[in-house]
């Protein structure tokens, strides 16, 4: 599979990710990495990166890793733990790790960190294969 082409396709087709500012910077088999430049609009009332922003990054990162196997997927389940507030953060990075690749279900752990490598959130996400080639 041409992972660079897949990365470009995912960035082009994911309109919500584009709106949210999430860029997929790397995809390889069972792995993806995304980045986000934090804007004031992404902060909650206490000045921390909004949890929905962290969740969006985790879902896009996990989903991008899941499609690395060549089939379309949809999110089946997600669980996230917010570990630290993202205060005075300029950039976020999320990385996925494949936990299970089954015939129908794929499971990933995603870590979201700030530019100082501080771990802000950890998510476990399951994706259902739609058994449709990309």
Q: What do the PLM-derived regions correspond to, one by one?
A:
Residues 1-134:
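Terminal targeting signals and extreme-terminal segments of soluble enzymes
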């Amino acid at each position: 599979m041409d992972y660079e082409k897949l990365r470009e396709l995912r960035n082009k087709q994911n309109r919500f990710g584009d709106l949210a500012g999430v860029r997929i910077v790397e995809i390889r088999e069972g792995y993806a990495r995304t980045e986000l430049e934090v804007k004031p609009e992404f902060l909650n009332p206490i000045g921390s990166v909004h949890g929905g922003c962290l969740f969006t990054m985790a879902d896009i990162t996990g989903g991008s890793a899941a499609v690395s196997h060549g089939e379309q997927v949809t999110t089946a389940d997600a669980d996230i733990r917010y570990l630290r507030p993202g205060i005075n953060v300029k950039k976020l990075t999320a990385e996925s790790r494949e936990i299970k690749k089954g015939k129908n279900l794929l499971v990933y752990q995603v870590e979201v960190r700030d530019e100082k490598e501080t771990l802000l959130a950890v998510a476990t996400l399951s994706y259902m294969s739609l058994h449709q080639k990309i």
